């Protein structure tokens, strides 16, 4: 279920301030963030965010197609290495 339209999209205030400061100076630094819950705004296009996945910061370059999604969608938290193979079938 999505967020109510009357509430509007959510973005952490500190993250928005950082992006606005980068846009004012036309700087393209990597923005390190733990805010996986923040919605991607059109102001974020062209910036790279280092989104924390619980272990490390994953670089996420924001493009036009990502607007409206959350930052956490592009930094997976779980690593799946597959099920254990049956030793009898490998011989």
Swiss-Prot record:
PROSITE patterns: RIBOSOMAL_S19. GO terms for biological process: ribosomal small subunit assembly; translation. Coiled coil: none annotated. GO terms for molecular function: rRNA binding; structural constituent of ribosome. The keyword Zinc does not apply. Keywords: Ribonucleoprotein, Ribosomal protein, RNA-binding, rRNA-binding. It holds the Pfam family Ribosomal_S19. InterPro entries: Ribosomal_uS19, Ribosomal_uS19_bac-type, Ribosomal_uS19_CS, Ribosomal_uS19_SF. GO terms for cellular component: cytoplasm; small ribosomal subunit. Gene3D superfamilies: 30s Ribosomal Protein S19, Chain A (3.30.860.10). Belongs to the universal ribosomal protein uS19 family. Protein S19 forms a complex with S13 that binds strongly to the 16S ribosomal RNA. This is Small ribosomal subunit protein uS19. It comes from Shouchella clausii (strain KSM-K16).
